[in-house]
Amino acid sequence: MEFTHLDENGMVRMADVSGKPPTRRKACASGRIVMLPETIALLRRKELPKGNVLAAAKIAGIQAAKQTSTLIPLCHQLNLSWIDIEFEIGDDSIGIAATVITRESTGVEMEALAAVSVAALTIYDMCKAVDKTMEISAIRLDHKTGGKSSAAEYHPRTAILVMSDSIAAGTATDHSGAILREGLQKAGCAVEALTITPDEPVEIAATVEAWIGEGIEFIVTSGGTGLGPRDLAIDTLAPKFTRRLPGVEQELLRWGQTKTRTAMLSRLAAGVIGNTVVVCLPGSTSAAKDALEVLVPAIFHAFPMLKGDGHA
């Protein structure tokens, strides 16, 4: 198991999320503080000596969510879009629920948990003069959405085609195909083939057509998307698309452009041939890594849709 918060020497470090595209993320956490019924009665009547307990607790919880990266050393500084805290007053306890939303490259679970924790501590502080029996309990993450954990669980049968005269001739080594295979396998895909062909249209087309005939659902190609005379992937495969996937193309180009200025020269393409999704990538290792960040797991939603199972 790979731990992102440990370096090769076992020392703690922040996880590097710079390679992850920002997405909408939401986390909800909850907790409870138990107290005497008499304390609840004072709170309801707003007769506690320190004033409006729940108003102060809500503000404190919101501030705690904003300050999570300061309180917890390895948390990232995030631009939080929305924070809300709600209270449920019972006979002998107060339930606390926090919701935090952001559009960032990592989640806001810790921010939601921090909000609940500090809201509970604030209630404790403001009531402790009249109640020595209070107990904070059951602080937990209820659910989160966004990022990879909320993606569709479908994992397509996959094949990877590397197009390169030099790699096919044995004068160069394939790295991009290996990166794609490792990344897609980690994402749960069954990578059934990794094939290397020269930049020959007939061989490229024959390989892809054979895979489609075998029921391969997801084909990722590497190489042949540039402006050179032997960059023939797009010229060979794009005319076979029954439908283009412009959103996939745009996101791959946009993400690549944030890393490499020359990404705008790529002719990468994405489309559907029958019921097979085909994504044609540049041949660089950086393009392969970027594609994994962009495609996984969002692209997996396409396959149930192609089968007529809707947009769930």
Swiss-Prot record:
The keyword Lyase applies. It holds the Pfam family MoaC. Its EC number is 4.6.1.17. Residues 156-312 are annotated as: Molybdenum cofactor biosynthesis protein B. Residues 1-155 are annotated as: Molybdenum cofactor biosynthesis protein C. One of its GO terms (biological process) is Mo-molybdopterin cofactor biosynthetic process. Pathway: Cofactor biosynthesis; molybdopterin biosynthesis. SUPFAM superfamilies: Molybdenum cofactor biosynthesis protein C, MoaC (SSF55040), Molybdenum cofactor biosynthesis proteins (SSF53218). GO terms for molecular function: cyclic pyranopterin monophosphate synthase activity. Gene3D superfamilies: MoaB/Mog-like domain, Molybdopterin cofactor biosynthesis C (MoaC) domain. It comes from the Bacteria. Disulfide bonds: none annotated. The active site is at residue 125. The keyword Ribosomal protein does not apply. Substrate binds at residues 74-76, 110-111. Keywords: Lyase, Molybdenum cofactor biosynthesis. It catalyses: (8S)-3',8-cyclo-7,8-dihydroguanosine 5'-triphosphate = cyclic pyranopterin phosphate + diphosphate. In the N-terminal section; belongs to the MoaC family. PANTHER family: MOLYBDENUM COFACTOR BIOSYNTHESIS (PTHR43764), MOLYBDOPTERIN MOLYBDOTRANSFERASE (PTHR43764:SF1). Catalyzes the conversion of (8S)-3',8-cyclo-7,8-dihydroguanosine 5'-triphosphate to cyclic pyranopterin monophosphate (cPMP). This is Molybdenum cofactor biosynthesis bifunctional protein. It comes from Chlorobaculum tepidum (strain ATCC 49652 / DSM 12025 / NBRC 103806 / TLS).
